Amino acid sequence: MSQLLTARQAEELHKAMIAYLLSANLPKSAAALREELADSVQLDDSTAKKYEGLLEKKWTSVVRLQKKIMDLESRNNALQSELDSATPTSLARRNQDPVSWLPHAPARHILQSHREPVTCVGFHPVFSSLASGSDDTTIKIWDWELGELERTIKGHTKAVLDVDYGGPRGGTLLASCSSDLTIKLWDPSDGYKNIRTLPGHDHSVSAVRFIPSGAAGSPLSGNLLVSASRDKTLRIWDVTTGYCVKTLRGHVDWVRDVVASPDGRFLFSAGNDQVARLWDVSSGETKSTFLGHEHAVECVAFAPPTSYPHLAALAGLKKAPPSSSSAEYVATGSRDKSIRIWDARGTLIKTLIGHDNWVRALAFHPGGKYLLSVSDDKTLRCWDLTQECKCVRTVKDAHGHFISCIRWAPNIIKDAGVVNGDDTSTAASANGGALGASAINGVVPTGKKEDPGGGPMMGIRCVIATGSVDLKVRVFAS
């Protein structure tokens, strides 16, 4: 008898082995084992039924435990490597200062439910809800804190290409766009009911973004939405009426991406024509064009005011633009594998080289010091704007396939009652009169009474999400 097992354990194992052989239709082998064990195991047919499947369960349990051990060892090695390369001073500073936080492996959560590639992700401005869209035509709503799927939204008939939360104050909506040529608006406060469908584009709608309130003093402030399409146009919509209020023309090929400036005054777009354009929302005119990429431009981003001092220094300026100004610096990512940083006039400041495949999405760190990028090379890269845009961290194999998107959770403004244009008092009343823990999880105060622009103190949520052709969404969080 094995010294590793007690007599009782050995008997249970033998019964499970015989039951397995019988269930596998191997009666001769089962009989041979019974004969070999002689009288040490009493197992009639009725008792054998109780042991069916037991061996398989134990086997799969062992496999799961082995996988858990390997995952924990991998996580431990990654953390140990990070610890070994850090000094006590840098560790203390990182623990205290969210401005220096960067994502690292392993991800906090791996969210799996989509049946085809994940194309887009978007964070709710207040609560711990994360939306993801996919080629499988669905939108899925996750709780990124718990790593759980909350619901699946169906309505589009082709691939969902982008999602974004925003809208009027106190009335956050989710917008989605699709290859089915439509944009749809969903109400999170009413079970994500589809409240409006916006037709009008003549081809796939590639990107959709809410325009923050205060767009050039427009009476429609807070109600505007912009979309980009393969039909070569941008369209601005009034979400309360569903009407297209403006069509912007200038691109001569598929418009891949569009974003709005933080104050809603400007739009930045780019596409297959290898050109990026800065637009004035109120006039609908192109303010600047950005030329230099050698392939389609996949993604664009506005630099936050917190990055102005670093980018001004990079541009050789002695004084940074005021943080109250809008759209001073922008970034573009391209299929030519490069990232380019520009000023608002279209002057190239810096070209970032390092990715080995198409650059698919960009996100500036809200603290202003870093730019994050993801690529078809399966990596997530962090570029330090204070070190000549040096790549200071690479999360290798962040996904198992091409990475299609990245979003940083929006900041929470601590004392203004407004969260990125959303009235938190409404959200609080819907949650029993006060913001629950999930509404503020992941928030780390900056430690400053005011932001650089003189506004209210903001809390940086050290949370990002990425999506991939590997069908998964990954959440990286502090």
From Swiss-Prot:
Residues 9-41 form the LisH domain. InterPro entries: Dynein_regulator_LIS1, G-protein_beta_WD-40_rep, LIS1_N, LisH, PAC1-like_LisH-like_dom, WD40/YVTN_repeat-like_dom_sf, WD40_repeat_CS, WD40_repeat_dom_sf. The keyword Transport applies. GO terms for biological process: cell division; establishment of mitotic spindle orientation; microtubule sliding. It is found in: Cytoplasm, Cytoskeleton; Cytoplasm, Cytoskeleton, Spindle pole. SMART domains: WD40. Residues 60-87 form a coiled coil. WD repeats lie at residues 113-154, 156-196, 200-247, 250-289, 292-352, 354-393, 398-439, 440-477. GO terms for cellular component: cytoplasm; microtubule; microtubule associated complex; spindle pole; transferase complex. Keywords: Cell cycle, Cell division, Coiled coil, Cytoplasm, Cytoskeleton, Microtubule, Mitosis, Repeat, Transport, WD repeat. Gene3D superfamilies: 1.20.960.30, YVTN repeat-like/Quinoprotein amine dehydrogenase. Positively regulates the activity of the minus-end directed microtubule motor protein dynein. May enhance dynein-mediated microtubule sliding by targeting dynein to the microtubule plus end. Required for nuclear migration during vegetative growth as well as development. Required for retrograde early endosome (EE) transport from the hyphal tip. Required for localization of dynein to the mitotic spindle poles. Recruits additional proteins to the dynein complex at SPBs. Dimerization mediated by the LisH domain may be required to activate dynein. This is Nuclear distribution protein PAC1. The lineage of its organism: Eukaryota, Fungi, Dikarya, Ascomycota, Pezizomycotina. The gene is PAC1.
